[in-house]
Amino acid sequence: MKKLTIISLALGLLMNTEAAVAQESVIQSTALKLPVGTFANMKRTTFDPTKHGFKFSNEFQTQIQIAGLNGPRFGGLCGGMVYSALDYYKTNEPIPAQTHRPASGTTLHQYILTRQNNSTLLNSNGGSNADKWAELILNPFGWRTNEFFNWGLQGSNGGRVQELVEMMRSGSPVPLGLFKDGNGGVGPHHQVLAIGYDLGRYKGDLGDYKEDFKIFIYDPNYPNQTMTLRVNPAAQNYYYQERPDNKWLTYFVDKKYTVARPPAISSTPLANDGLVRQLLIEIGTGGDDLRGGNDNVNVIVKYTDGSTDIYPTVNKRVRWMDNYKESVLLSLRRAAPLGQIKCVMLQTTFGGGIGGDNWNVDLLRIVAKSSDQERVVFAQTGSPLVRFDGNNRPFEAVLR
């Protein structure tokens, strides 16, 4: 697992959302500065959130561990999802079709995590957005609040409107950083993808018709939707037309993005025979985590004829942190009618007690997938539903 730097994770804490790099090419902004009133009034790229965006929401959580102890925890990998979606788009690769958030340790999760690191600090071209965030955070007594807000409306002298227009001339979407004021500058901030803009009657001159200005957004917090970033000059904020409670003081144009080759994640259509071919298993860890390493969990699928299939180490030897849900998609080795699948069992591999591991499972939900339907076949919760304490007795979920 490629580890994030402590500095990058610290930036991740500031951007807590209400959620191997190769073949690189740098997006270059046009060197020629555009005089006020000469840029294109509107621009839409071909990026469509329903086609090019992820189908799952940005509900990730990540926790720093220091000397084996659980440290700070932050939510959301918005920058990683934005960079990754743009990678798939620019390399003409199909974005993964899965609707569930990828579990910790999976190929897609690791890639998004790496791209989160790139988006905040350590980009592969040596660039960094740390200076952008730091400048906005350092605003004692709000002395620069008006200035920061106006940057988002300036169409000249390096203003954000000018940067956005110049970078979108080529038809490429552009990542944005959204800065939320207050709370001592610690956010929650956000990262999104600008996929178009419309100036309306606004000229980029800080004059009339500021309210006309719109930026069309792919936001990983809102899959399959196009959000519209609008301006409220009286309140000095930028907000979503569709969700006015989402608002920020200002934004910046991310000119440090470099494209990378994303992983190919297969999604073969299920055979049209009505048989259950996949099980989506959602496991909510309670107040005691699954350690990973040598302490893991296996899934056993048992059929009515007495046969079983074992899927070992479904957590991929990665820690599943407390009070967090992970999802595992099993492609069954033996497709079968639902009535022939008797139960699904969770079996741990560790010893309990001092020096061992204990694991609380508060939620277990199982969805059976065939070509024509998805059906919830087990759903139970508890506090905990089951505690694995080293006796290695499996928990049996009888399907309905």
Sequence positions of predicted segments:
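Short, hydrophobic/aromatic-rich segments at coil-to-beta transitions
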Residues: 168-177, 212-216, 342-345
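Bacterial N-terminal signal peptides
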Residues: 8-16
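Cys-His-centered catalytic/binding microenvironment captured across papain-like cysteine peptidases
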Residues: 185-189, 198-277
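Cysteine-nucleophile protease catalytic domains, especially the papain-like/related folds used
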Residues: 45-157
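Positively charged n-region of N-terminal signal peptides that target proteins for export
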Residues: 1-4
